[in-house]
Swiss-Prot record:
UniProt keyword annotations, A-Z: Chloroplast, Plastid, Ribonucleoprotein, Ribosomal protein, RNA-binding, rRNA-binding
Keyword Ubl conjugation: no
Ribosomal protein recorded as keyword: yes
Localization: Plastid, Chloroplast
Subunit text: Part of the 30S ribosomal subunit. Contacts protein S5. The interaction surface between S4 and S5 is involved in control of translational fidelity.
BP terms from Gene Ontology: ribosomal small subunit biogenesis; translation
Organism classification: Eukaryota, Viridiplantae, Streptophyta, Embryophyta, Tracheophyta
Species of provenance: Equisetum hyemale (Dutch rush)
Protein name per Swiss-Prot or TrEMBL: Small ribosomal subunit protein uS4c
Amino acid sequence: MSRYRGPRLRIIRRLQNLPGLTNKLVESKKKKVSGSDQSIQKKVSQYGIRLEAKQRLRFNYGLTERQLLNYVRIARCAKGSTGQILLQLLEMRLDNILFRLGFVPTIPSARQLINHRHILVNNRIVDVPSFHCKPKDIITIEAPKTYQSILSKRLESFAKDQIPEHLTLSLSEPKKPKGFVNYLINRESIGLKINELLVVEYYSRKA
């Protein structure tokens, strides 16, 4: 399954707010279920809940189905909680790090900057959005002057308290902001409200 490129509002209306996909918000609506539909809903509810959690994770981080499945397989082979390791792998992607630092409004915007070779990690150009960032990595932007002015205005209005503790944003040089990876992210700093165990359960027969 390819990466979704359709209307983002349609997705968040179905899956609720996904900060990585879009900064637009929708109000949650609870559907009323009639008595005749309750028995049917009970049969599909567990699968439906797991599917929705999986879809929220996939669309928030902008992954294809195959990419997410591969991350689940990697997490299963690692020591520790599969769900937490899965979230850690996704959060430490370069495109997500740019988003969490406030360099871009969404993860798709970050992916565009990376693909255009405007992002440096430790002074080396990285053009792979899935690049796995590590502690002590330094991230900088080498973009056209037109974007630099947009970035400066964005960072001026971006609240630093939104940046998770495992990252640091330096504005000592306004025209050359830097992002620092302090350590691997912990569960409390994950930017998406998600029950990762539901995702692991969804893939239990596939991974």
